[in-house]
Amino acid sequence: MKKIDELRNMSVEELQNELLSLRKDQFNLRMKKASGSLDKTHLITMVRKSVAKVKTILTEKAGK
């Protein structure tokens, strides 16, 4: 997962691509959990928080 400073230095397009990638990861993790093949359930929380970070930075950049 990327640090907040790394995310702030990214452009809006890069952030949107990062968000799309995180959403795909989140979906895949949820499907694995539903099928019972996910051992590391903490990854779901990590990805969810990363999505929130990216969305927050996108909102900050939109306000400027």
Curated annotation (Swiss-Prot):
Keywords: Ribonucleoprotein, Ribosomal protein
Record bears the keyword Disulfide bond: no
InterPro entries associated with the record: Ribosomal_protein_uL29, Ribosomal_uL29, Ribosomal_uL29_sf
Keyword Ribosomal protein listed: yes
Biological process (GO), any one: translation
GO molecular function per UniProt: structural constituent of ribosome
Source superkingdom: Bacteria
Signal peptide region: none
PANTHER family from the UniProt entry: 60S RIBOSOMAL PROTEIN L35/50S RIBOSOMAL PROTEIN L29, LARGE RIBOSOMAL SUBUNIT PROTEIN UL29C
Similarity comment: family membership: Belongs to the universal ribosomal protein uL29 family.
Protein name per its UniProtKB record: Large ribosomal subunit protein uL29
Species whose genome carries this gene: Legionella pneumophila subsp. pneumophila (strain Philadelphia 1 / ATCC 33152 / DSM 7513)
Source taxonomy: Bacteria, Pseudomonadati, Pseudomonadota, Gammaproteobacteria, Legionellales
